[in-house]
């Protein structure tokens, strides 16, 4: 069976495995206070073009989201995101478990617009009883979005300006950041993104690492006791160098972006294969997540041979399915998918 189920169903990049093996016998301090982690942090500061950026390594995406949100917000504050936002739909209520309401707004193509945000904030502030409500303190977006969409340069700049207008912190979930930044739809680079948010993270788990995310405070200072809060949230790895080594490797010779470009090339081809066989594209995603519309019959025919995910049962005749590429996707796997589809053309 070939698999396009997710971008974290392989182990890790061979380069990372090699680096971990070479350093296995080293003895270093724990919790990220080691030379490998320091080297990785310095490389990330250089990559974001901000020598004052504060960088922290956490073990996973959900832990990262809850830790950042809980650390930045006061107890009475909530976080705004679109209705399809990852923290709203796919994190088991983790943010709210730490006492912060997720305030959902409708998105446009899975993105939050400045118009929607401004309208909500104006209405909220005009309500005389708003001091009795959960106070919006942060905006959360993901880049790319849950549907693989990319915020443009203009959209991101406008959204950050709107957040600043209403004294909201902007937090960007970058679990798949590499794939978003190298896509043809993205008209900016990592330094631009870092300058147009308060805090973001660089995803490792879904972009070649065994595990780990790198939180970067680029537009604000890290909250007091952030490191302690990382541990409180269960996101601190005792053998912290394991994360440092991985990000040090990813940010050597632009490996992070090279593997992301490979995934995008594979996604572009997988889309063309579906289109060649007359299979409709559900969402115009320019990144490594591709969404197609399958009939129940085609779904049943593909399932024993190809691993992928049902995204939405749109109707009794249409099933939206997600196919995901990664650093590990091989041309031969796409050839096999094409061959399988030919039998049902």
Task: Label the model's feature ranges.
Residues 99-137, 141-144, 151-158:
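PLP-dependent aminotransferase-class I/II
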Residues 54-73, 103-110:
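Conserved core of the PLP fold type I
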Residues 135, 142, 150, 187-286:
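Active-site C-terminal subdomain of aminotransferase-like
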Residues 13-61, 83-88, 94:
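Conserved N-terminal alpha-helix of the aminotransferase class I/II PLP-enzyme fold
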Residues 71-89, 118:
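Conserved PLP-anchoring active-site segment centered on the Schiff-base-forming lysine
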Residues 75-76, 268-269, 273-343:
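Conserved C-terminal alpha-helix-loop-beta "cap" of PLP-dependent enzymes
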Residues 151-183:
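Catalytic PLP-binding core of fold-type I/II PLP enzymes
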């Amino acid at each position: 069976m070939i698999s396009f189920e997710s971008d974290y169903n392989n182990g890790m990049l061979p380069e990372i495995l090699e680096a971990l093996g070479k350093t296995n016998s080293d003895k270093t301090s724990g919790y990220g206070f080691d030379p490998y982690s320091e080297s990785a942090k310095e490389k990330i500061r250089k990559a974001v073009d901000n020598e004052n950026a504060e960088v922290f390594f956490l073990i996973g995406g959900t832990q990262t989201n809850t830790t950042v949100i809980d650390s930045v917000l006061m107890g009475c504050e909530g976080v705004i995101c679109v209705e399809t936002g990852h923290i709203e739909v796919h994190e088991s209520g983790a943010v709210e478990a730490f006492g912060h309401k997720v305030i959902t707004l409708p998105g446009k193509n899975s993105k939050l617009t400045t118009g929607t945000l401004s309208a909500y904030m104006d209405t909220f502030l005009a309500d005389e009883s708003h001091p009795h409500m959960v106070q919006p303190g942060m905006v959360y977006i993901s880049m790319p979005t849950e549907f693989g969409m990319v915020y443009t340069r203009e959209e991101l700049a406008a959204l950050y300006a709107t957040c600043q207008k209403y004294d909201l912190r902007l937090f960007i979930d970058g679990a798949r950041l590499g794939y978003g930044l190298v896509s043809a739809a993205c008209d900016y680079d990592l330094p631009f993104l870092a300058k147009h948010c308060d805090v973001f993270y660089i995803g490792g788990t879904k972009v070649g690492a065994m595990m780990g995310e790198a939180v970067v405070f680029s537009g604000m200072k890290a909250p007091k006791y952030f490191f302690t809060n990382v541990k409180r949230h269960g996101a601190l790895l005792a053998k912290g160098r394991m994360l440092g080594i991985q990000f040090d490797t990813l940010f050597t010779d632009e490996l992070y972006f090279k593997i992301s470009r490979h995934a995008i090339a594979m996604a572009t081809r997988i889309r063309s294969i579906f289109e060649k066989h007359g299979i409709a594209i559900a969402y115009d995603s320019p990144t490594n997540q591709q969404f197609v519309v399958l009939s129940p019959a085609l779904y049943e025919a593909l399932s024993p041979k190809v691993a992928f995910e049902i995204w939405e049962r749109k109707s009794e005749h249409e099933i939206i399915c997600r196919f995901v590429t990664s650093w590990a996707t091989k041309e031969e796997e796409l050839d096999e998918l094409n061959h399988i589809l030919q039998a049902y053309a």
